[in-house]
Amino acid sequence: MDEFHRCGKEDSFWQQCFLYPLFFQEDLYAISHDHYLDVSSSSRPMEHLSSNDQLSFLTVKRLIGQIRQQNHSIVLFVNCDPNPLADRKKSFYSESVLEALTLVLEVPFSIWSKYSVEGMNESKSFRSIHSIFPFLEDKFPHSNSILDARIPYSIHPEILVRTFRRWIRDAPSLHPLRSVLYEYRNSPDNLQRSIIVVPRVNTRFFLFLWNYYVCECESILFSRLKRSSHSRSLSHGSFPQRTHFHRKIKHIIIFSRRNSLKSIWSLKDPKIHYVRYGERPIIAIKGAHLLVKKCRYYLLIFRQFYFHLWSEPYRVCSHQLSKNCSSSPGYFLRVRMNPILVRTKMLDELFIADLITDEIDPIVPIVPIIGLLATEKFCDISGRPISKLSWTSLTDDDILDRFDQIWRNLFHYYSGSFDRDGLYRIKYILSLSCAKTLACKHKSTIRVVRKELGPELFKKSFSKEREFYSLRFSSKAAARSQRERIWHSDIPQINPLANSWQKIQDLKIENLFDQ
């Protein structure tokens, strides 16, 4: 990999590298064999594992020949036999070949992505999903409209192969990829007869396809937006759900009402800002309504002519930030005016001026979260706590741990909102639901449970916010916590409740356009 990278920097050798001979390297299949055993051992029971899972390189070469000959007796994606032990040897070799194919294709892709980032010094990828909010804090208040787009999932296999040819000139190395893609497209489980590229599929091959597909879309889109806009540069950042990360925030970022914010992205005359979390890109635009309509039209045409995809209208929707709330990952987002009183003393006279600035105001969706808690049987539809009957068979420690995990995730994820009063209502619902669950388990009352357990009942589950401030900040900083928003660098994914609410919001948008 280092040799490929060195050659790629010097003479763009990575565009012309011959990858097909790598398919016949025994070391490559030894790596894929070990990786497959590691993954399968974590998902299969111990009685299904065997010490005879040895890799035969001759069998691998026969399977490669079958792929080249379009022999569909090899099945890489479907196991039609319900017996997990039947035909396991065949599945073992198929997975090894698929793993090796992914490893070979990852070589030029990783070089290309690193080379483009180091050469352009523009793309920024962060591990924590909270990294999206400092970007919004810094860029979105200066915009007046946003385009909420979604990356299409379904794509034809030949389009993927054609885009691979842009940076892989070794045509024989693409024949196995084409065969594998068409085999998946024609498999009985694939009812849509297309390649569904999603970031949530937990396989190395589909994660690679997703990373490649997103990078291909963004690299072309950025260059087109730069040419079409009058700004000298385009600010953009890509966030979680990717397997390759070039930069990482290592510390917690605190934004205060009173302190001026230091710019993270230093740009000259920016007018278009692009941010993506998962499969949802957001483009913020500062300009007239006609410019917003042109950008929306351009995105639809771009997908239609470059990827041969017909995008539904709801997949690219526009609205003004000053009038509407946008649903970002788990938050309601709006831009509000923040008046600041400034006193300037010159000699004996005192001048008072009012400055009005715009700032992003993340709002916790309390009512939808309570509705989701009611769906999960923690409370009724009005928010009244009830016992979690399905957990009464667990031990007391397990019950406390589960409520503790729910509250800790909610509190950490929504710590970036100034108004956290609604979170304490959710805390009340969870704490009383925990007490009722324990009371139902022991066939007693809440008063008896509190008397028996005493302060230990909620000491473990519902004091995490105090521990958080005491461990990470001084007492003075903890006193200012009500006027500060805190973004964390250790949140790799959206909170499950927030993710469920986000899906409901997306369905509402789809139904609105269907009517």
Curated annotation (Swiss-Prot):
GO terms for molecular function: RNA binding. It comes from the Eukaryota. Pfam families: Intron_maturas2, MatK_N. Its main location: plastid. It is found in: Plastid, Chloroplast. Keywords: Chloroplast, mRNA processing, Plastid, RNA-binding, tRNA processing. GO terms for cellular component: chloroplast. GO terms for biological process: mRNA processing; RNA splicing; tRNA processing. PANTHER family: MATURASE K. Usually encoded in the trnK tRNA gene intron. Probably assists in splicing its own and other chloroplast group II introns. Belongs to the intron maturase 2 family. MatK subfamily. This is Maturase K. It comes from Pinus coulteri (Coulter pine). The lineage of its organism: Eukaryota, Viridiplantae, Streptophyta, Embryophyta, Tracheophyta. The gene is matK.
